Regions:
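Generic signal for short, ordered secondary-structure residues
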Residues: 34, 59-60, 78, 139, ...
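Acidic, glycine-rich active-site loops and adjacent beta-strand->loop/helix elements
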Residues: 39-41, 68-72, 178-179
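A cross-domain feature marking catalytic cores of carbohydrate-active enzymes
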Residues: 37, 66, 110
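Acidic, glycine/proline-rich low-complexity segments that act as flexible tails and inter-domain linkers
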Residues: 1-44, 56-58, 62
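Short secondary-structure boundary/capping elements
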Residues: 43-47, 127-130
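Glycine-rich anion-binding loops and their surrounding alpha/beta cores
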Residues: 12-27, 82-89, 94-190
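Alpha-helix N-cap/helix-start motif
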Residues: 13, 44, 73-74, 184
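A glycine-rich phosphate/pyrophosphate-binding beta-strand-loop-alpha-helix module
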Residues: 46-95, 100
Length: 190
């Protein structure tokens, strides 16, 4: 937790992500877009899901990963996708089959990396987010050519950008997303 208070450097984030990716041994599944969804929505509905699904309907293979329940009073992607008619994947094989069928698949952190899933759930116990909240957005487990990450606190933008660069991500976009998810604030000015 001291690392979180001090704030992780981009080098530390890149090292955490590299170690995680080495541990995962994720299969080689072709995806165009890695979309992380870890924050949950507090003020608005997760409209970004509609954008991801429209991309999928138009031939873009979107892999979304995230976590739910770690922060109270949030609406998480895992809760909304079934309401939109999209089942949550539980294995890499399901991810591959679903991507081949509809170009969109979601896999939770609990499913693809249970140790990090357990740590992220300690948020309410410890009273603050852990470095896992930061590094999970950068994992890009299927090594997509393009990665989307949202941060809530602008101070994290630079560390995410530099970590992505150190990880060799060619096309990585980091924005201050509404509620920490990858979408602009619908109430904000353009």
């Amino acid at each position: 937790m001291l690392l979180r208070v001090k704030e992780e450097s981009s080098e530390e984030l890149a090292a955490f992500v590299t170690a995680t990716r080495d541990w995962l041994h994720a299969p080689q599944i072709a995806v165009d877009l890695d979309w992380s969804s870890y924050a949950g929505k507090r003020k608005h509905y997760p409209w970004f899901l509609l954008a991801a699904l429209v991309l999928a309907e138009n031939g873009v293979r979107v892999f979304m990963h995230g976590a739910s329940g770690h922060t109270i009073n949030r609406l998480y992607t895992e809760e909304v996708l079934p309401e939109l008619g999209h089942a949550l994947c539980e294995t890499w094989q399901e991810v591959e089959n679903t991507l081949n069928r509809v170009n969109f698949a979601y896999l939770s952190l609990d499913a693809y990396c249970p140790p990090l899933g357990n740590i992220i759930q300690l948020r309410n116990v410890l009273g603050l987010r852990s470095p896992v909240h930061t590094l999970s957005r950068l994992i890009n487990p299927l090594n997509a050519q393009c990665s989307l990450q949202a941060i809530f606190h602008p101070a994290y933008r630079e560390s995410h950008q530099f970590a992505a660069q150190q990880l060799g991500y060619q096309n990585s976009m980091v924005i201050k997303g509404e509620g920490g998810e990858f979408e602009r604030n619908p109430d904000g000015r353009c």
